[in-house]
Amino acid sequence: MDFDERGPCSSNMYLPSCTYYVSGPDFSSLPSFLPQTPSSRPMTYSYSSNLPQVQPVREVTFREYAIEPATKWHPRGNLAHCYSAEELVHRDCLQAPSAAGVPGDVLAKSSANVYHHPTPAVSSNFYSTVGRNGVLPQAFDQFFETAYGTPENLASSDYPGDKSAEKGPPAATATSAAAAAAATGAPATSSSDSGGGGGCRETAAAAEEKERRRRPESSSSPESSSGHTEDKAGGSSGQRTRKKRCPYTKYQIRELEREFFFSVYINKEKRLQLSRMLNLTDRQVKIWFQNRRMKEKKINRDRLQYYSANPLL
């Protein structure tokens, strides 16, 4: 429908062929929706014009992150009619720290929160200061306390290096204290005497006995002592992988592998000769050959499965 056909359409405006534009003389009390120049039509709205004007997105972005000075983006004078008296009091409380030297970005973020998210039930310290986590306000600290424990636990968990010491049971702490007392000697005894109880001495003695029992004996044979030490180290540090204990030296393994290459099964004479040459017992040579045969069997089985699964190889 062209523009020149809209004129006679005002009398029968409810017909389907009409575009619902009305002219000024028919309805003189209403503002004209279609002026003479269609390209420049001022749209009038039914609501009042005293609502706060919405700022563009760039201004809101700059104000939220305080990229430019706060005074440029906060028209404080003409927004007073939008908020209740309680929120105005909170805004006055916010303006006081700015005179005391609060950084501009903190003030900008807090004032933006006050202007854009009015809540009647907020308290005055909700937006004024930043909370313990450094990002959210102080009112969110209660959620951090319930999620991560009490404030004391929060303060202690800031340093992960001390977690193992704090998580340790009191028995381990008493054991370490008893070991320190055994190392110092007389001062620890005098302090336990000044504690004034035979129970303290008995506890320290029991802890010292437990510590002594936990230490590996160094008087055993080299092979067993090295194995026990490695087991202890692997048990104490769960992260560290336990080093494999091998009772044979590289020279012994090389000679045994050479003999195994010539014959998988070894007779008694050859076994005695090898044990004398390699400074091993007859039983050690026998067990090594048994283990080596089992290893060879497993290698052959894996090789067979690999080549049967890949027929092109």
UniProtKB/Swiss-Prot annotation:
| Official protein name in the record | Homeobox protein Hox-A11
- Which Gene3D superfamilies does the protein's record reference? Homeodomain-like
Q: Which parts of this chain does the entry mark as a DNA-binding region?
A: 241-300
Give the domain of life: Eukaryota
User: Record's GO cellular component, any one?
Assistant: nucleoplasm
The organism is Homo sapiens
Free-text function comment from the UniProt entry: Sequence-specific transcription factor which is part of a developmental regulatory system that provides cells with specific positional identities on the anterior-posterior axis.
Q: Which family does it belong to?
A: Belongs to the Abd-B homeobox family.
Keyword Transcription regulation present in the record's keywords: the answer is yes
Locate the compositionally biased regions of type Low complexity.
168-193
Localization recorded for this chain is: Nucleus
What's a Gene Ontology MF term here? RNA polymerase II cis-regulatory region sequence-specific DNA binding
Name any one Pfam family assigned in the record.
DUF3528
Biased composition (Basic and acidic residues) is annotated at 207-217
Principal location: nucleus
Disorder named in the UniProt entry = Radioulnar synostosis with amegakaryocytic thrombocytopenia 1: The syndrome consists of an unusual association of bone marrow failure and skeletal defects. Patients have the same skeletal defects, the proximal fusion of the radius and ulna, resulting in extremely limited pronation and supination of the forearm. Some patients have also symptomatic thrombocytopenia, with bruising and bleeding problems since birth, necessitating correction by bone marrow or umbilical-cord stem-cell transplantation.
Gene Ontology biological process terms, A to Z:
anatomical structure morphogenesis; anterior/posterior pattern specification; branching involved in ureteric bud morphogenesis; cartilage development involved in endochondral bone morphogenesis; chondrocyte development; developmental growth; dorsal/ventral pattern formation; embryonic digit morphogenesis
Chain ranges passing through the membrane: none
Disordered, as annotated region? 154-246
